[in-house]
From Swiss-Prot:
Single GO molecular function: neutral L-amino acid:sodium symporter activity
Domain of life assignment: Bacteria
Membrane topology of this protein: Multi-pass membrane protein
Protein source organism: Neisseria meningitidis serogroup A / serotype 4A (strain DSM 15465 / Z2491)
Assigned protein family: Belongs to the dicarboxylate/amino acid:cation symporter (DAACS) (TC 2.A.23) family.
One Gene Ontology CC term in the entry: plasma membrane
Designated name of the protein: Serine/threonine transporter SstT
Record-linked NCBIfam families: PRK13628.1 (NF010151)
Localization annotation: Cell inner membrane
Gene3D superfamilies (alphabetical): Sodium:dicarboxylate symporter
GO annotation terms (biological process): serine transport; threonine transport
Keywords, alphabetical: Amino-acid transport, Cell inner membrane, Cell membrane, Membrane, Symport, Transmembrane, Transmembrane helix, Transport
């Protein structure tokens, strides 16, 4: 017993990133050396994906409803320009990911994907019709059937109603439920190393190394989009606000915020770091004390990239050709879906099924794509969080410095 406890304590002291990396490496070895054992280990992957499928609909519903219910009206701290920058940045990231997904179409190997047939929509009209019908689905059925469009719609409506008519106690109960569900998600994510081990070992046993090559290309597209946003798009947005060389500010935010966020992999955990940096930059305290925590929820360029690229990869893998109008709609959906993803472990990955539903892709296939996201998540999630969190303080600084420039003129 003492040995078992000490072993668990020793494992607990190892970071989740290293545990996932170890599970990934062990899965490759087992799947290559003993395919039969690799296939048997696939049970761990199936259990992990099953747990994600069970919690994802509840997570989206509770989290979005709580976020809307807790929103404060009548804030006079110059927040609106920053929110505009957050939305512009997130939509620009989603649009960049759409273009990259079309220029570099990626096919990924999904276990059992050949057994699932997805009927591709004929075009934007059919997609919009399906979207509208899903909006008015029964909320209980929407959660039970993982209809993420319906879940999002009902969560927005319920959150708005609670904000306007609910008591403080009721809103706090919803917030506590959101925190509880987020905690359950974190517990499930703690089993990610074991789940990744099972997924990788069974994938290698079934398909060989072709799947990992597909994942490498997928990761290259994801990281390429994030680097492009961080070093090209975001500086252009900052220049638009401050009208001077944006790169000193950009590199300061990447160095003093992005590096921390890369290793913590949590925008929420990086809020104190961003607060300290905002104070160091001499920004307006009444502004950044609100915009930094808000940005940890709604400023989600990295999440929008992840959702868009993986959803398009799922579409191409299922043989669905994506027209530009549908891709543009995907950008909008990814922008809305990304809001609220950062404070939750694996949040952006768990919102991929919502985007996949635009293409008529089943929830089973979508959750296999989520599993692929966890396989590459050792790097993807770190880079995504670094982009998200560093942009929180970057856009806050840009808006504040832009306001100072306008006042001086």
């Amino acid at each position: 017993m003492a040995f078992g406890k000490s072993l668990f304590h020793a494992i607990g002291r190892v970071s989740l990133v290293r545990q996932i990396a170890a599970g990934l490496a062990l899965g490759i070895v087992i799947g290559s050396v003993s395919p039969q054992l690799g296939l048997a280990a696939g049970l761990f992957g199936s259990l992990f994906v099953g747990a994600l499928k069970a919690v994802a609909p509840v997570l989206v519903f509770i989290l979005v409803a709580a976020t809307i219910a807790q929103h404060q009206k009548g804030n006079k701290a110059h927040i609106r320009p920053i929110i505009v920058l957050y939305l512009i940045g997130t939509f620009s990231a989603a649009l960049t990911a759409v273009i990259a997904g079309m220029v570099f179409p990626t096919h990924i190997v999904l276990a059992g994907a050949g057994d699932v047939s997805a009927a591709p929509p004929s075009g934007i009209v059919e997609v919009l019709k399906s979207l509208l019908m899903n909006l008015v689905a029964n909320p209980i059925n929407a959660i039970a059937n993982a209809n993420y469009i319906g879940i999002l719609a009902w969560a927005l409506v319920l959150g708005a109603a609670l904000r306007n008519h609910g008591s403080d106690v009721t809103r706090q109960v919803v917030a506590d439920l959101a925190e509880a569900v987020s905690t359950v998600v974190k517990w499930i994510i703690r089993f990610a190393p074991l789940g990744i081990f099972g997924l990788v070992s069974s994938t290698i046993a079934e398909t060989g190394f072709g799947a990992l090559a597909g994942y490498a290309k997928l990761l290259a597209v994801l990281l390429g989009c994030m680097v492009f946003i961080a070093l090209v798009v975001n500086p252009a947005i900052v220049w638009w606000k401050i009208r001077r060389n944006p790169y000193p500010l950009v590199f300061t935010c990447l160095r003093e915020s992005g590096v921390y966020a890369f290793f913590t992999r949590s925008s929420a955990a990086n809020i104190p770091v961003n607060m300290a940096l905002a104070k160091k930059l001499g920004l307006h305290e009444d502004t950044y004390s609100i915009s930094i925590p808000l940005g940890a929820t709604v400023n989600m360029g990295g999440a929008a990239i992840t959702i868009t690229v993986l959803a398009m990869a799922a579409a191409y893998t299922q043989g669905i050709q994506v027209d530009f109008a549908t891709a543009l709609l995907l950008s909008l959906v990814a922008t809305v879906s990304a809001c609220g993803a950062s404070g939750v472990a694996g949040g952006s990955l768990l919102l991929i099924p919502l985007a996949c539903s635009l293409f008529g892709i089943s929830n089973d296939v979508a959750m296999q794509v989520v599993a692929v996201g966890f396989i590459i998540g050792v790097i993807q999630d770190s880079a995504e969080t670094a982009l998200n969190s560093s942009t929180d303080v970057l856009f806050t600084a840009a808006a504040d410095l832009g306001r100072q420039r306008n006042r001086a003129e």
